[in-house]
Amino acid sequence: MAHSKQPSHFQSLMLLQWPLSYLAIFWILQPLFVYLLFTSLWPLPVLYFAWLFLDWKTPERGGRRSAWVRNWCVWTHIRDYFPITILKTKDLSPEHNYLMGVHPHGLLTFGAFCNFCTEATGFSKTFPGITPHLATLSWFFKIPFVREYLMAKGVCSVSQPAINYLLSHGTGNLVGIVVGGVGEALQSVPNTTTLILQKRKGFVRTALQHGAHLVPTFTFGETEVYDQVLFHKDSRMYKFQSCFRRIFGFYCCVFYGQSFCQGSTGLLPYSRPIVTVVGEPLPLPQIEKPSQEMVDKYHALYMDALHKLFDQHKTHYGCSETQKLFFL
């Protein structure tokens, strides 16, 4: 297991800001707007919801990113908590569009968030001319205020219309998809490198339809920042987790890390290095209706490229020479 340092209390508070900001939207801002409907300030929520109706399709039409939000100093403190870094192995030309596979999911995808949804690690300087979009569950964009906060950071919906729009309007767009999805969160255990990928081929088909280059990435350390309690598939808790996922779209995982006090257990992640290695892009032809054989061919090439990327860098970032990358 990787060594865990004790971050400063300030860094810990900055990290807590991330989930607490969403809780504040859910439990304070949204109820406040409902309350305002019954006061003399009722025009404010009415105007917002009218605008929300007119703006409903924006998450599927490129979103509305904010350079100001992406450059908030709070993200640099979250970066330094672990720390989080990004490693470029090849340049990405702004003359093409890219579909990037993000691996592994981990529990909270700290690496993908910090590297692609903020400028804390200098993405724009590392990949000039490339605009990153990290895709997430579509239903987040149906929640008032949450949708604006996500779009400001460059997050897009993982829906097919949203991805099609980004890959067909202009060049220099990079869409990141956490291919393993929420199911991979249950594989997020320290010292394991297991990805759900063998049957996940839709992203390859989409890349072929648009002639987008496939970019493999692997985030070392993503599964090391929390310990997770795993339940047997016949247990009631596992059945509850499966039911929870069917309703809400993600698993209710039981996990723990460290607290503000050194040596004690809490819900803060362990302060262990997270490094996202961005691999060499794999050029694809543009085929409007790719055959299954063509999809299988490029899916196999992608898995091979990802496997090589992992093997080339694993010993530099906490993995042993004998550690293998497994695909489910």
UniProtKB/Swiss-Prot annotation:
Source species: Homo sapiens
Function per UniProt: Acyltransferase that catalyzes the formation of ester bonds between fatty alcohols and fatty acyl-CoAs to form wax monoesters. Shows a strong preference for decyl alcohol (C10), with less activity towards C16 and C18 alcohols. Shows a strong preference for saturated acyl-CoAs.
Transmembrane segments: 12-32, 34-53
A GO molecular-function annotation: long-chain-alcohol O-fatty-acyltransferase activity
Family: Belongs to the diacylglycerol acyltransferase family.
Pfam families xrefs: DAGAT
Membrane topology designation: Multi-pass membrane protein
EC number: 2.3.1.75
Upper taxonomic lineage: Eukaryota, Metazoa, Chordata, Craniata, Vertebrata
Domain of life: Eukaryota
The protein, known as: Acyl-CoA wax alcohol acyltransferase 1
Keyword rRNA processing: no
